[in-house]
């Protein structure tokens, strides 16, 4: 993220799908073909990856002077960079600190949050924004973490950007901000659609997710400039897919020590590369 002039909020290590994780998935009825790390902060709390998400939680809580951010948008410049997994585990780790948290699936083009939590998606955000103002049915409970509520996307609409820019969406965020300590929002990739830019003006700040050796710095710079022009704030970058040799996690009596190192590279680098121990 040095190339972008943004803070690095966390480095998330690459996760191997171990036999332990497969057993957990089978136990919970989750598909083994689904993202194996979506609920890692619950299902494998002692893993290096879960620890990295707790580091992200700490980074976010100290990212604003005065008070921690309340409404946080999580997005990426391109698809398949881990934004939904990052949004989910950010919400989980915040809720694990014993505060009320809600996560909203605002990816109305390719919603995924309901499937990770094992929830029905026949009703959700799009119903509310289209006139059904029943907030009780909108807020779903995830039984493994009572402090976390989930707002699924609902049926995919023909006009996602119009719904997300509506007065109803702004009113809903105000309502949820009065009810929850933190509101985490997942959106479509930033470059492909205007949805993330629209939502960025309605939240306290944005978390930009990137994938090591995949993400385009050029596209991320474009998004950063677009957000800057709108007057919105980017808290920093979460870099996914870091190889195990790049990040060290040591555990001492239940506590952890997190450190990372990054190599210098030149300004012509087209991708955000993996960081290596020096």
Indicate residue ranges for each PLM-predicted region.
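Short, conserved active-site loop motifs that form the nucleotide-linked donor/cofactor pocket
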Residues: 147-148, 235
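Short acidic/glycine-enriched loop/turn segments that link adjacent beta-strands
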Residues: 145-147, 193
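Residue-level preference for the first positions of well-ordered beta-strands
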Residues: 71-75, 100, 148-150, 182-184
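Conserved catalytic-core segment of NTP-binding enzymes
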Residues: 1-5, 118, 130, 140, ...
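Short boundary/hinge segments that flank catalytic cores
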Residues: 1-99, 106-110, 116-122, 158, ...
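N-terminal glycine-rich dinucleotide-binding loop that anchors FAD/FMN and/or NAD(P) in oxidoreductases
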Residues: 119-137
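Structured cytosolic domains appended to multi-pass membrane proteins
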Residues: 104-108, 130, 148-155
């Amino acid at each position: 993220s040095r190339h972008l002039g943004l803070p690095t909020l966390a480095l998330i290590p690459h996760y191997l799908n171990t036999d332990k994780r497969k057993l957990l998935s089978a136990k919970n009825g989750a598909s083994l073909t689904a993202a194996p790390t979506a609920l890692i902060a619950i299902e494998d709390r002692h893993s290096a990856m879960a620890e990295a998400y707790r580091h992200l939680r700490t980074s976010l809580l100290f990212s604003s002077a005065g008070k921690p951010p309340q409404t946080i948008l999580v997005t990426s410049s391109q698809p398949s960079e881990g934004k939904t997994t990052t949004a989910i585990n950010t919400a989980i780790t915040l809720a694990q600190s014993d505060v009320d948290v809600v996560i909203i699936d605002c990816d109305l083009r390719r919603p995924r949050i309901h499937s990770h939590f094992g929830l029905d998606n026949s009703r959700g955000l799009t119903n509310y924004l289209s006139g059904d103002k029943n907030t009780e049915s909108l807020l779903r409970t995830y039984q493994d973490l009572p402090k976390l509520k989930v707002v699924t996307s609902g049926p995919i609409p023909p006009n996602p950007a119009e719904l997300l820019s509506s007065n109803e969406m702004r009113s809903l965020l105000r309502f949820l901000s009065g009810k929850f300590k933190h509101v985490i929002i997942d959106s479509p990739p930033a470059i492909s659609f205007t949805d993330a830019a629209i939502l960025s003006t309605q939240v306290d700040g944005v978390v930009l997710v990137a994938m090591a050796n995949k993400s385009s710095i050029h596209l991320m710079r474009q998004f950063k400039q677009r957000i800057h022009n709108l007057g919105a704030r980017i808290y920093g970058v979460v870099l996914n897919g870091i190889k195990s040799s790049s990040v060290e996690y040591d555990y001492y009596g239940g506590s952890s020590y997190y450190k990372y190192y990054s190599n210098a590279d030149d300004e012509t680098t087209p991708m955000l590369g993996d960081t290596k121990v020096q």
